[in-house]
């Protein structure tokens, strides 16, 4: 009999109908918001907990600790509730109210750091708590079980769903788990696929992805697996996110808008390409931030 964890993965891959250039290229997007906790992070959350269980590092009833900007925390809170763990999540206090509410709804304890401390501060505090013996740190930024989830599931799904036709893979970079795992799988196939990462432009803020300082670059990231990194401005990501909703019927978050903006750039410069981008989550997590507000649309953004 299937349990909730068996509903993670095997998400749809759909072709954009009204966005993108008219040069024979195709843009396909993988709808990770269809996972039970609503994001691509469901895959990594399940992998980190299940693999730690297999190694005997954790057991139900234990306290788990993680620093998160939102989606990983929601996913971990769901898996922890399903498997009987106590979850402590640390995040900056400028993350959306919807994300906080979802974590608490699953029974997680939420510990906030200031927006000035940011994710770096959340990571430092999570490590300090683990060192004091307050729980097991899952450490998504340095845990190989994070990209392993995408090497064993997301990558193979994309390859199968495109019948091996994919020429370019585009993904926003946060923990870098998705791009690292998928690119590792694609590198092992019998054709070259160009891997493109997305990061915010200097000075831009895009929830869920980062332009990491060198000392905080996730340990799981392998630069040799990424062919190109594109800088995306916050406004471009938000406009593309809104355009996806009103032109394609895809209601997603800002980082997904950034990924599709990057995919459009790739498609425009590569006639005949088959480009796959990750839609990381759903737009309902961002309603309180105002990015879907009437003012944005009245100014012509994203339409």
Task: Describe each region flagged by the PLM.
Residues 1-303:
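PLP-dependent amino-acid enzyme catalytic core
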């Amino acid at each position: 009999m299937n349990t909730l964890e068996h509903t993670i993965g095997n998400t749809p891959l759909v072709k954009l109908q009204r966005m993108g250039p008219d040069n024979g290229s195709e843009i396909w997007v993988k709808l990770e918001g269809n996972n039970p906790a609503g994001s691509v992070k469901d895959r990594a959350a399940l992998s980190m907990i299940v693999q730690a269980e297999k190694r005997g590092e954790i057991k139900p009833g234990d306290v788990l600790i993680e620093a998160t900007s939102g989606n990983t925390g929601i996913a971990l809170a769901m898996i922890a509730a399903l498997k009987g763990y106590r979850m402590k999540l640390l995040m900056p206090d400028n993350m959306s109210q919807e994300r906080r509410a979802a974590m608490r709804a699953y029974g997680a304890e939420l510990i906030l750091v200031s927006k000035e401390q940011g994710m770096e501060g959340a990571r430092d505090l999570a490590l300090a708590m683990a060192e004091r013996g307050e729980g097991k740190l899952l450490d998504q930024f340095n845990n190989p079980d994070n990209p392993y989830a995408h090497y064993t599931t997301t990558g193979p799904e994309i390859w199968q769903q495109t019948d091996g036709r994919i020429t370019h893979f585009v993904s926003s970079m946060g923990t870098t788990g998705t791009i690292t795992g998928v690119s590792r799988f694609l590198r092992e196939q019998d054709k070259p696929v160009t891997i493109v990462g997305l990061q915010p432009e200097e000075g831009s803020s895009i929830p869920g992805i980062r332009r990491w300082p060198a000392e905080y670059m996730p340990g799981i990231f392998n630069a040799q697996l990424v062919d190109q990194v594109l800088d995306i401005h916050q406004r471009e990501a938000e406009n593309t996110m809104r355009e996806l909703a009103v032109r394609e019927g895809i209601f997603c978050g800002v980082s997904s808008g950034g990924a599709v903006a990057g995919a459009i750039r790739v498609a425009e410069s590569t006639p005949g390409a088959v480009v796959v981008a990750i839609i990381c989550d759903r737009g309902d997590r961002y309603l309180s931030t105002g990015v879907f507000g009437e003012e944005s649309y009245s100014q012509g953004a994203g339409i």
